[in-house]
Amino acid sequence: AAGLLAGCGGTGTENGGNIGTPGGESGVPGAAAESGDSSSSGGAAAAGEGTAKDSVVVVMGPTSEPESGFDPAYGWGAGEHVHEPLIQSTLTVTTADLEIAYDLATDMKVSEDGLTWTVDIRDGVAFTDGEPLTAEDVAFTYNTLRDTSSVNDFTMLKEAVAVDSDTVEFHMNRPYSIWPYTMAIVGIVPEHAYGPGYGQHPVGSGRYMLKQWDKGQQVILEANPDYYGEAPKMKQVTILFMEEDAAFAAVMAGQADLAYTAASYGDLTVDGYNLLAFETVDNRGFNLPAIPAGSTDENGVPLGNDFTCDVNVRRAINLAIDREEMIQNVLNGYGTAAYSICDKMPWYNEAAQVTYDPEQAARLLDEAGWVMGTDGIREKDGVKAEFTLMYSAGDSVRQALSEDTANQLRELGIDVTVEGVGWDVAYDRAQSTPMLWGWGAHTPMELYNIYHTAPGGTYAQYSPYFNETVDQYMDEALASSSLEESYELWKKAQWDGETGVTVDGDIPWIWLVNIDHLYWSREGLKVAEQKLHPHGHGWSIVNNVDQWSWE
C-alpha cells in the first residue's frame, strides 16, 4: 500500500563480534568491483572519486532496485515502500518526529473548504542541467502523476496550476487534509527534460545525481555540487543490490559499509561490524473476514467466513496472541508488539493496545457458545472453529509467524492450517480466508485503505468489513482544515469509546509484530538518526545518507 512519511528516531543496538576478518579499512570504496562486478567504474575508488571519509557502500535487497527507474510517476520515492527521492527535491519533508517541514516550499495554506492548497516555492533552485526550477515544473509534476502514476492514487487532485513562477495552487476534487504528506514524497521533475526515458537518465534538484546504473547490480549516486541546501557529507553513495546471503557474504569480505540483514543472522557477530536495529512501523498482521460466507462480489469472488464473522471470535483471537513470544522466537528479539497498523504514529490510538490474556479469550468464546469438542477444537451450530491462514510463499518470516499463530490458537481450541500462496491468488482468496500481510506507512491513509469502505463498494478493499461510524470519522479527518485536528478523528476511527476497529470494537484485523530493520554497519560509520522506518527494508535507510559521516 502506498504510504508516506517516517517517524521517531530509530534505535540502534550494537553487537560487536569476532566472526571473520573483513578485508579493507573503514569506509573502503570500490565494493562493487571487489564483489565481482566487471564494470570499470564500480564503486568510488574505481570511479576515481570520493575517499574513505566521504563515500559509502550500502547493500539493499534486489527488490529495492527501481524497475522503472528514478521516475516519481512509476514508484520512485512514492511507491509501496516510500522513501525520500534523493535525486529530486520535494515540496515538504518530515522531521524525525513526523512534523511537516519545508523543502522547496517556503509557505503553504489551505482554503476553508479544503479544496485549494496554495504553496510558495523557494527562489534560486536549479535543476542539475542548470535550468531553474519553477512553479510550472511543480504543476507539471503533479498533473503528470495524476494522469500516469502507476503506483499511487492521485484521484483527490483535480489540477495543479502555476499562479506565477514561484506559486502553485492545488485544486482538489475533495478535501484532503493530509496533502502535506503527499508533498513530502513526490519528487519534482523538470517539464523541459521529462519524457519516456526520464527514469533512466533523471534530472533533478535534489541532494544527489545519478552517476551510474548497472542494472541488476548497482547504482552510484554523486553529490549535487549546486544543491541549495546543506552540502552532503557523503559525496558518493554506491548502492549494491544483493540477495540476503550475498549481502552477508559481502559483509564478511569487508566489501560493504552497511548491509541489510534479517533476524536469523541476529545472533552472529562479525569482526569490524556492528549490528544496528532500527524500529519500524513495518508490521505483520492478518485479516479476519467480518461477514458470514455465502455472498460474492461483482466479479464472483467469494466473500465472508462463517467462523471469523463472529466479533467475539475476533476479539478472543486478539487477546490470545502472545506477541512477545513471537518477537523472541520468530524475530530473535528484533521487533516490537503491534496493536494497530499505525503504532507510534501521531494518529495512533493507544486504546488499541491489548494485554495477552488467554483466559479471557477462552471466556469470550465460552460465553459466545463456542463449545470445546472432544478433539480439542471448538464448535458452534455446526461450524468448526477453524480457518486457513495464508502467507506469501517463500517468505520465511511470514511463514514462521503464521505457524506460531496456529500453535497459539490451537491452545484456545481453534484449528488453523497455514498455507503458502502466490500474490496472484492471495487478494481474491483473502476476501474469505485470512491472509498474513505486511503493511506500515507514514500516512493516516493506511488506516483508510485497510478499514474504509472501498469507493463504490460495499466493504473495505482487502477484507470484507464495514462500519459506517468508522467511515464517517475517516471522512471527517480527510475533510478537516487542520492536519493536527485530523489526528484526533483518525484516533476515533480506531476507538471512540463505543465503536471502532480495536480491542473492544470490530477487530477485523489482528496485528502481531513490527519488524526491526537490521543492518550490519562497519565500525566508524555514523548513521544519522533514523525516522521510524515504514514497510519495506530498502531505500528508507538512506533517507538522510547525506548526513552520515565517518569517525
Question: What residues fall within each predicted segment?
Answer:
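Surface-exposed binding/hinge segments that line
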Residues: 109-116, 152-193
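Ligand-site clamp/hinge motif
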Residues: 225-269, 415-417
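Detector for C-terminal structural segments
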Residues: 214, 218, 318-349, 353, ...
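Gly/Pro-rich hinge or "lid" segments in bacterial periplasmic/extracellular proteins
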Residues: 96-99, 175, 181-232, 236, ...
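Alpha-helical secondary-structure segments
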Residues: 134-141, 165-169, 206-207, 235-236, ...
